């Protein structure tokens, strides 16, 4: 079989202007980037304000493993197959960060014959949205540092006289706005800034990956440009010496930060291998952020097509949970059905049983033990009142006997249905039955419900997520986290939903606990207020907001050939 890059490079593409017209966009609603991609102007939202809405399908997965479950492959394959059976469909996915592209995970365009193309354009830069987020974020960091410098240098009276601005009295120990970078670089996690003569005051800071920036979450959760501007104004950059919030609006930098992102708020239109439309927008990670593409992209697509396929990052305890409790809570766009992706390899890897047997070899004991993980995720999705279809992403080494065993086992659960998907190897033809089953599931009446109400306390929300969302015995709050619960509550932010930042490699906080962990306590070491995005992040265990590169990083495989074409992406 050809590589992903070879398949992408040989694809016959529809000109993006024609693709947009087929989708229902007007020429003036598209800003073309050559013939392969276009920005979609938000004026389409006003033009279609009264349009009836399509059905939203959320794709999630079992607990991730190093073998890859194929969630994006399934999302794109399903979109292609819906088109093949005569349904008007559109995928809405996140823009890939270059951190994972050059790190371990690789690209995020799908794979095989279920891809967004050209895949190299999607995986590297696209239309520059992530760079815009980085620049806007770092402007905020530069602004707070400069304000601290000048206030410290001049004092209150002289600063106000010379600048005409109010003295903010910034507490250097309470500057909460790090800088960001779209790469994995562990050495920047903790830094001192302001070193050297006339560069201070010195204070502790750090870098996060851009996907963890609150601005990225704001981009994904804003309803329109005015909403994004208001959210950026609410960003908490620091506290003053009296413990009061200093926002981006207080600093006078919110307008400029918004100006940098004025084009980033527009989704990018691309296509799948069979010419189905795909809107790419925003890129928050699901382990350290809320892990879903934008509300704006969903809103536009739902007004133009019958079925919108979107996905939440990692397993259903991560991106799907945050899709429900954060994204849907803010958007009101309720899903009609969910697709839960699994593989035979994933279940064996999640069995918790050590074995010398190759993961591709039939192993009834590990498969049955690992099924508990899939069963947990089925029940987790069903907990939100959404019909769930299990999609088994077939690998070439899978046996018919094990596939049939798994289908029979799934049919004894709360799942609406179960289908094997060959989208990777067969493209649109490989997920036809999955498409029909998803359509039937979406036609049933979804009884969507949130996991907790807005008016629950922060501690109650944390407990509910741990105990109901993960099956934990409870939570433990560090002294710092307890103080932050009190602080955020006193500042009036207890109504916000909670975003758990934890490992994606286990339902629990411990990546070594496979399958369905029990009797564990979730350790919450700190909270982060994201007043602009509209949620409180809980840092669980040792999760990092700046990843590091591994011993065999992905960049080792990436190069250009003699013709100047990029090779090694995938």
From Swiss-Prot:
This is Formate--tetrahydrofolate ligase. ATP binds at residues 65-72. It comes from Shewanella sp. (strain W3-18-1). Belongs to the formate--tetrahydrofolate ligase family. It is an enzyme of class 6 (ligase). Its EC number is 6.3.4.3. It catalyses: (6S)-5,6,7,8-tetrahydrofolate + formate + ATP = (6R)-10-formyltetrahydrofolate + ADP + phosphate. Gene3D superfamilies: Domain 2, N(10)-formyltetrahydrofolate synthetase (3.30.1510.10), Formyltetrahydrofolate synthetase, domain 3 (3.10.410.10), P-loop containing nucleotide triphosphate hydrolases (3.40.50.300). The keyword Magnesium does not apply. The keyword Transmembrane helix does not apply. One of its GO terms (molecular function) is ATP binding. HAMAP family: FTHFS. Keywords: ATP-binding, Ligase, Nucleotide-binding, One-carbon metabolism. It comes from the Bacteria. GO terms for biological process: tetrahydrofolate interconversion. NCBIfam families: PRK13505.1, PRK13506.1. Pathway: One-carbon metabolism; tetrahydrofolate interconversion.
